[in-house]
A protein has these predicted regions:
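Short amphipathic, positively biased membrane-proximal segments
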Residues: 1-196
Length: 196
């Protein structure tokens, strides 16, 4: 093979590798965005279940839950309050609530991005995998991280109903996130259709 043909073959191989790397990076970005969208849907579903269960919970359990929460607030609101105190900022009640809701969604979206990128490497399939993801997230966030960061009380201070409600709501979050990712992955790829 002549030197010029060898150089052309090398250049073609480099172009193919670059194109493959670009497709892989694009695929990763698309999957991360899909994870963010699915996570937002998951948080929305979690909220519906959590609020329903909260509204039907024993009033004594609700009172105990509020009493042990830092400042009587759920973790996202407690984080916003802590940020206000650290920066000397005073938000209006409406701004505090809006920012707290954004933080709450961010707390649910961030792990969903990771889940979307890694879910094919995780045990289980379909909604069972989503349920395991949601239950695992409940254990990590609600039972461990909220306590360690001071955004929640020690788990034993909450009534059993709070743990049950959290587990059910987060399991629904995981299933909803998985279903949304499945739906997104089955959507027609318009850019692929226009390139063919």
């Amino acid at each position: 093979m002549s030197e010029s043909k060898r150089d052309m073959t090398k250049a073609d191989a480099n172009k193919r590798m670059s194109a493959g790397s670009a497709r892989e990076a694009n695929s990763t970005l698309v999957m991360a965005l899909a994870g963010a969208a699915a996570g937002a849907f998951g948080v929305w579903a979690l909220d519906r279940v959590d609020w329903f269960l909260w509204d039907h919970e024993d009033p004594k359990a609700r009172t105990q839950t509020k009493a042990v929460r830092p400042g009587g607030e759920p973790p996202a609101q407690a984080l916003v309050t802590r940020s206000e105190e650290a920066t000397g900022t005073v938000l209006s009640p409406e701004a505090h609530e809006t920012i707290s809701q954004a933080v709450h969604y961010a707390i649910g979206i961030a792990p969903a991005v990771g889940y979307a990128l890694l879910r094919d490497k995780l045990p289980g399939t379909g909604t069972a995998r989503g349920a395991l993801y949601g239950a695992g997230l409940f254990l990590m966030q609600d039972e461990v991280l909220n306590t360690v960061t001071g955004l929640g009380a020690k788990p034993q201070q909450y009534p059993w109903q709070a743990h049950a409600r959290g587990l059910v709501a987060h399991t629904v979050y995981g299933i909803a996130t998985e279903l949304a990712l499945n739906l997104i992955s089955k959507a027609p790829n318009k850019s692929a259709a226009t390139n063919n």
